[in-house]
Amino acid sequence: MGIQAAEISAILKDQIKNFGQEAEVAEIGRVLSVGDGIARVYGLDNVQAGEMVEFPGGIMGMALNLENDNVGVVIFGSDRDIKEGDTVKRTNSIVDVPQGDELLGRVVDGLGNPIDGKGPINAKLRGVADVKAPGIIPRKSVHEPMATGLKAVDSMIPIGRGQRELIIGDRQTGKTAIALDTILNQKSYNDAAGDDESKKLYCVYVAIGQKRSTVAQLVKKLEENGAMEYSIVVAATASDPAPMQFLAPYAATAMAEYFRDNGRHALIIYDDLSKQAVAYRQMSLLLRRPPGREAYPGDVFYLHSRLLERSAKLNEDFGAGSLTALPVIETQGGDVSAFIPTNVISITDGQIFLETELFYQGIRPAVNTGLSVSRVGSSAQTKAMSSVAGPVKLSLAQYREMAAFAQFGSDLDAATQQLLNRGARLTELMKQPQYSPLTNAEIVCVIFAGTNGYLDKVALADVGRWEAGLLQHLRGKHAELLAWITNEDPKIKDDAAGRVKAALDEYAATFA
């Protein structure tokens, strides 16, 4: 077979023409030492603070300490396969996460990777995890209600869209239960809103340092109640490395900010920030940053303030969206004056204080109504609710004061006796089983009944039964009254009070 020169030259010409001249340039460094999830890297001279770097085997890390002769990198994953002398590559990108509606109904880790086995998330947008909070100009004061469906909270500690309300208490006092009920309560509002995005509320739940079984149970509960369709769960569990637990709240906030910045409304629950602070303390000490009070680093206040300041109500010029935050803090033995609790109390717009004592007395949710406050929520309360909630606060405050004195004296005058009786019944009325949130109108009617003496003759043990019967009666025979309160939002006095009283009188006559 002869050599065909023309054909060979044609092939050579073709190859020369298509010769790629691009050379891939990557800035690399070498691992000096590695251990406890921290790598010291030499040679990454131009790396930025907070930049992602890549180790062999695709393990990612984040540059946190930029020192004269080396870079301190925290590792998102196991450091077992990283050894001294390994090459580390810059990625030239600050830590970012996927954003958008594609995340709804999914469970992701602290970097936005799916961990629910439902395939990849094809998000079109990505956002930087740790961005600056909105300034003063884009904001507006909180004025729309964010209903939790809990009688004790919606009446006495109202929360508005764009508010930060801390849920604080010892372990096993029902902190997560309040947060979960709030998510479940949005189902009826979101379904009623139809296509009106301004009425819907999307929920993001961040589990920080919790057991995997606990997170799985929570996701199952959300799925059973049809709440996953408007929720995102971000999980950095106890078995995840500290950097993941530190990063998860920021990543989740970036996902929630997508809704805030597009004129929609979102709620984010951080469960819980005590564990994030512990993870950050671990990272800081291993990076040899100087410890401060309780061995936390000096910037632990900034850790939480820059996170919670991202929750805001934006004004009309910026789309009128909002991001509401419910951070959870676990106290040790009811000590609210510890470092982290005092920090977060000073950052937030109020707190729901839960007590072990009340929990064991069977008062659940175990809200201490005396210590709990909402600093901005009252302006977001519906007219109907604020008109019935005032007397409750007063009655319960007087009851707590009198109950303390009543232990000493046996012969009490009729007025004091009446005050104690009503206070006991109102306390009983504030109890609510888990996973059974009520609508705004139902809470208004129940509380109106309590403050207007409908329960004074009912035995204390029968209050729960009386309330359950009333709700059934209202839903069955007075659905139009509930709809009227929901849609018109009247102040419950004069004519409106007359309509509610008529329904209550009708029920009271049948109760036995």
UniProtKB/Swiss-Prot annotation:
Residues annotated to bind ATP: 169-176
Gene3D superfamilies per record: 2.40.30.20, ATP synthase alpha/beta chain, C-terminal domain, P-loop containing nucleotide triphosphate hydrolases
Catalytic activity: ATP + H2O + 4 H(+)(in) = ADP + phosphate + 5 H(+)(out)
CDD domains per record: ATP-synt_F1_alpha_C, ATP-synt_F1_alpha_N, F1-ATPase_alpha_CD
Keyword Membrane part of the UniProt annotation: yes
Record-linked InterPro entries: ATP_synth_asu-like_sf (IPR023366), ATP_synth_asu_C (IPR000793), ATP_synth_asu_C_sf (IPR038376), ATP_synth_F1_a_nt-bd_dom (IPR033732), ATP_synth_F1_asu (IPR005294), ATPase_a/bsu_AS (IPR020003), ATPase_F1/V1/A1_a/bsu_N (IPR004100), ATPase_F1/V1/A1_a/bsu_N_sf (IPR036121)
A GO MF term: ATP binding
Subcellular location: Cell inner membrane
A Pfam family the protein falls into: ATP-synt_ab_C
Cellular component, GO, one term: plasma membrane
Disulphide bridges, residue numbers: none
Signal sequence residues: none
Membrane topology: Peripheral membrane protein
Presence of the UniProt keyword Transport in the record: yes
Keywords recorded for this protein, A-Z: ATP synthesis, ATP-binding, Cell inner membrane, Cell membrane, CF(1), Hydrogen ion transport, Ion transport, Membrane, Nucleotide-binding, Translocase, Transport
Catalytic activity, EC: 7.1.2.2
Annotated function: Produces ATP from ADP in the presence of a proton gradient across the membrane. The alpha chain is a regulatory subunit.
Name recorded for this polypeptide: ATP synthase subunit alpha
Native species: Ruegeria pomeroyi (strain ATCC 700808 / DSM 15171 / DSS-3)
Species classification: Bacteria, Pseudomonadati, Pseudomonadota, Alphaproteobacteria, Rhodobacterales
